[in-house]
């Protein structure tokens, strides 16, 4: 693998505003919630740990039995997305996505043991 870093842990939440308020009270740096794809998202910075909160996973319609709330996936940066996907069962993607807080990335989600997924990402452009 040519993994170059961990981007974040993704968590699905039902009450995004309530969870954002919780992390702000806990002293985390939290970005404002924003619309993204099929739901809303917010980034949480807890020292060395980054979380991304989602109200709906982009791959939610493609994965059976996804919980209403809880851990979704670990997002990993790579310098060769195509090589990372080789040998994995792809759940969603690859696709180029953009957002104001993360720039432009090429991403793909694959199944992993433990009823979770891995997200492999190539950063194409930094946020402006």
Model-inferred region functions:
Residues 51-53, 120:
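Generic preference for hydrophobic
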Residues 11-51:
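Core segments of cupin and vicinal oxygen chelate
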Residues 1-18, 71-74, 124-128:
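N-terminal beta-strand motif that seeds the catalytic metal site of vicinal oxygen chelate
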Residues 5, 38-40, 70, 104:
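Exposed loop/turn and edge beta-strand positions of beta-sandwich/beta-sheet ligand-binding modules
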Residues 60-61:
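A cross-kingdom feature marking solvent-exposed beta-strand/loop segments within repeated
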Residues 67-92:
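Mid-chain, well-packed structural core segment of small domains
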């Amino acid at each position: 693998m040519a993994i170059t870093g961990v981007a974040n842990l993704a968590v699905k939440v039902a009450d995004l505003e309530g969870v954002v308020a919780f992390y702000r009270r806990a002293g985390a740096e939290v970005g404002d919630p924003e619309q993204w794809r099929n739901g809303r998202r917010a980034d949480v910075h807890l020292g060395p740990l980054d979380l991304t909160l989602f109200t709906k996973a982009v791959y939610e319609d493609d994965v059976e039995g996804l919980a209403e709330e809880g851990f979704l996936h670990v997002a990993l940066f790579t310098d060769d997305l195509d090589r990372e996907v080789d040998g994995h069962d792809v759940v969603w993607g690859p696709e180029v996505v953009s957002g104001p807080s993360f720039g432009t990335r090429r991403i793909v989600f694959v199944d992993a043991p433990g009823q979770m997924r891995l997200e492999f990402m190539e950063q194409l452009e930094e946020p402006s």
